[in-house]
Amino acid sequence: MKLNNGQSGSITFIGTVSPAGGNLKEPVTESTKKAARCFYGLSQNRADKKRYPAVDPVDSYSKYLEYPEIIEYLDEKIEKGWVDKVTKTKYIIRKGKDAYEQINILGDDGVPMSYHEQYWKSELVDFVILQQDAFDEIDGSTPLERQKLMLD
């Protein structure tokens, strides 16, 4: 957006809700998610495991990654196919979560080795790419160029 002084700026819309009992399906939460078109789901489980930020990577999403103009911008700014890489990474994490649940139910020997591979691959993505130390000078924020190198 163009500011009155001639500089460019942006507007960020943030909608927050804290539903009683954590019910994310109640009407106010659903309306807020629909208006914001993105969702950061905080996870008590991740916080308990000291995995910060405690944003659940499976439940969280951004509908903006579906907009052609955003895809085009990211293709130009980072690299062609960036949204596909992000989608693939989220898929790895989702499959790892599913595999972890099966391993917990059936035990280590009750699942094929591929489940363990999926789980440990998702753990690697979680530890290396998703988790951050906000107090660390380097790890406090991740520039796009570093994100690109990490996903390559």
Q: For the regions a protein language model found, what residue spans apply to each?
A:
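P-loop NTPase catalytic core
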Residues: 1-152
